[in-house]
Amino acid sequence: MCLNACSKKDAKQETERLVCAEADMQSFPYTEDGFNVVKHQTITPVENVPGLEVIETYFVNEGKPVTVKAYDLCRTEVEAKDTVVWSLQPSSTNARMDWVLPVTEGFAKENYLGMNNSDYGGGIPVVDLWQRDGGIAIGLFEPVLRMISMPVEWKRYGNKVSMALHYDLPEPLELATGDTLKCFKAFRYTHEGDYFNALRTFSKYMQDNGIVTMKPSEPEAFEPVWCAGGYGRPFKMNMVLGTLDKVKELGFTWVDIDDGYQIAEGDWNTNKLFPGGDKDMRHITDECHKRGLKAKLWWAPLAADPDTKLVKEHPEMLLKTDEWAHEYITWWDSWYLSPINPAVDAYTTDLLKMFLQKWNFDGLKIDGQHLNCCLPDYNEASGLESPWDAPEQMPSYFGKIYDQARAMKSDAVIQVCPCGCAVNYFLVSQINQAVASDPMSSKQVRMKRKAYAAMAPELAYYGDHIELTDGGNDFATQIGTGSVIGTKFTYPEDNPDWMEGPFKLTPEKEALIRKWMKIYKENNLARGEYLNLYTWGFDYPEAHVIRQNNALYYAFYVDPVAPEGAMDPAHVDAATVPVPSYKGTLELRGLDPAKIYTAIEYTADEPREFEVNGANPTIEVNFERNYLLKVIEK
């Protein structure tokens, strides 16, 4: 442990900065123009975690008053050894960007963890840079998500990539003589490999120190999912009921009733498409249960349409911004409800009783990018000590949902889908099923899976609808990474009143589902242990390994390249994208050099077996899109 007041000779190594109204202080003690601000810092190596340091910083004003507007922690520069440095930048915007990004010359990204667009905010308070020989991560060890930025930049004509933890104070803070400014608790971690190691170490520290408690998933959370979303919002009850036998026949266990049953966001009773009201919803769950299926209900809490009965009768539930306006949710054309508000809590409890008891659903599919974060809440009815308690404590709202739902149904599966967002880390501890959350590509399914496996190894991860993967059929991405499989096929026809699709279960799609369902159930990789044996960005092809049933399951992937100007391969005509392929050598890491193994191409239509020597674990391959391999001791 080291406690010191930094002197002038340390200025070149300075990693903190104070942005003040009077000066930009970048070396300490700062003694210019009559100021005297001293930095004190404790740097504590964490026992038994090589490379991890906990950093606690505070500033003492020993001179004339100074007004602090912002501060930086852990400012770090990495010398680029190649033309690209890979990074974890888990912040959220409406661009729905990859969490993992290549950083090249000219790159700059702010990574603010508060609200960046009307619906988008939140993330993970960790930023990581790595190269072939290892990486360095910085972040916060705080009890809630602080609204910091994590800027990453590679300035043109240089060879340094910088990152920092930047905090803009909500209001300028005047430090009088003798006052102290205590900063957020930060960390720095040097590591081998990629972002998996950074997130695993961060999350393990958070759990070991009682800051968060991750919830292990029960067997039900790993069962395959069919979602009625393929029928769209104007779906009818008979469409769902008419599909159940086929759902059962194909091996799915969960039936997710999607958006469209409700009067409006906020008024969650059934609309005119369900004239029987509560009886119709109960009939759906009864028909599911009769077939041995489970039913999960889609729900977008904390959203209320302006013309709803809820808004008219309970304005005290609405979040108010610093301008005393309602916070708007663009996607739903709704307003935010206050997440930390006693009236909202009571309203939510009543809804849970309707969903899980009266309607008898077995779980919840909680959905919407707005669930990841919100603006500060100035609603006096919320009773907050600070308006910033709303975004910081927002995940606790979902913790209450989880606890109440599990009290009503002890094996309820609670999924939160922050669509397109980098998940709010503090949400992860309030659920028992994570989700790929509207992935833009197969690659996003895989990179998110790796992140969740690092943060919460026992948490089920649903790979979302297969229709959202490249080509709409990439079961290899879901199964090879240990994800729960799912689909939103329609049967026997699409909904003529819904323009999206087609999602119709064709003979070809049915054959594909039957093949991969058998593989999914026989190997049970979703319940296996994810091993971090390959480095994202530097090992090619992209590789993942799952340990399950005394076997190692390898999965290798090459991604399509979209035509110039296309947003993403998953959202262009497959005919215009060349099928990606790889021909060359693969190294099977993690094998014992003293043993001989049998390798099985377990997803091939005609599985091939061959021998692998652990002392020389390389094989020659030639494949398109993916190559999945099961390796067992001989």
Predicted features, each with a name:
Residues E16-R156, Y597-A604, P617:
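Polysaccharide-binding surfaces and accessory modules of carbohydrate-active proteins
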Residues P172-E192, E624-I632:
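Short Pro-Gly-centered flexible turn/kink motifs
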Residues D179, C183, F398-P607, T618, ...:
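Active-site-proximal substrate-binding groove within the catalytic cores of carbohydrate-active enzymes
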Residues G193-V212, C227, W254-D256, G277-T330, ...:
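Glycine-rich, aromatic-flanked loop segments that form ligand/cofactor-binding clefts
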Residues P216, A221-V225, G232-P234, L297-K358, ...:
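Active-site-adjacent "subsite" loops/lids of carbohydrate-active enzymes
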Residues F222-N238, A264-D278, T330-T349, A381-P395:
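The substrate-binding groove and active-site-proximal loops of carbohydrate-active enzymes
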Residues M239-Y261, K358-N360:
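Catalytic domains of carbohydrate-active enzymes, especially glycoside hydrolases
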Residues F610-K634:
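C-terminal beta-strand-rich structural cap/linker in extracellular carbohydrate-active enzymes
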